[in-house]
Amino acid sequence: MRLNKMTGRVIATMGIAAMMMTQTAGVMAAEQTENKQLKVVYYNQADYPGKKIGGSTIQAAGCGPTAVAVCYSSLTGKKADVPKMCKQAYKHGWYYTGQGCSHSVVPGLSKLYGMECKGLGMDKDAVEKALRAGHPVVALMGPGDFTKNGHFVVLTRMVGKDKVKIADVGSRARTAETWSLKKVIRQGKEGANAG
């Protein structure tokens, strides 16, 4: 797929029945045509008070579409309409009342916005390689530092040998920190019902 004469790939943790993925969890990736450090455009779920996604709010349950918005704007330089992306997630069945967005929101919205997804699995080396090539990596996190249940974040770049910067669409404080890539991979959520 082409996106403004640029192919984009978004990476997100995936499970069963997604984009030629196996039954084990994976990470979906989005590519650029050039290998360079990604200039990150940040969106936060709290910036849309009262805006809805299904029966909830973007602030409470819109992390998946907001993470895709970070990738879209970072890859294209265009402003994303986060509330519109959330409405599309609901319309296409990627949002489940009381549970949030499913793992399929990332490849689904990516396709709608002209980005091509590629599965990476939970392979630390593959994630590191994608980040060093300037590709954003969307990860669905499980219980730990980022969430009690499930939460999408965007890994944006490597820092040194084994640290990573993350655009956490639910926390500016966590976005300002640098994280161990091993720790992030360990906290990634596996399974098709993640998120």
Go through each PLM region and give its residues.
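Bacterial N-terminal signal peptides that target proteins for export
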Residues: 2-14
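N-terminal leader/targeting segments
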Residues: 3, 21-22, 30, 160
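Active-site-adjacent structural segments surrounding the nucleophilic cysteine of cysteine proteases
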Residues: 6-9, 24-95
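A broadly tuned, weak detector of single residues within folded domains
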Residues: 12-13, 56, 148
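Hydrophobic core
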Residues: 15-23
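Conserved active-site-adjacent core of cysteine acyl-enzyme catalytic domains
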Residues: 35, 72-195
